[in-house]
Amino acid sequence: MHAYVYKSQLKPDTYVYVPRRDDFSALPAPLLTSLGALTFVLDVALEARRRLAQADPDKVRSEMNERGFYLQVPPSVSSLMPRHYD
């Protein structure tokens, strides 16, 4: 499976993977609006041995097959901060 990756210009570190270049027809209109302009950044073959920096290739393939796209969002800030216990 092949994916085309686009970066949101409104949401930092947010990317959309689609199976066809420049085809955002599977994205719900409110989501597309909230992302703003999308800039092409990469085309990638989603092979079993392929590693992605911030996403699981199996999940990307599954969501693209099921929904027609995969949305990669940054990890929440709270998940990056160490937990403090009293």
Swiss-Prot record:
Domain of life where this protein originates: Bacteria
Signal sequence residues: none
Location of the YcgL domain: 1-85
InterPro entries: YcgL-like_sf, YcgL_dom
One Pfam family here: YcgL
HAMAP family: UPF0745
Protein name: YcgL domain-containing protein Smal_3906
Species this protein is from: Stenotrophomonas maltophilia (strain R551-3)
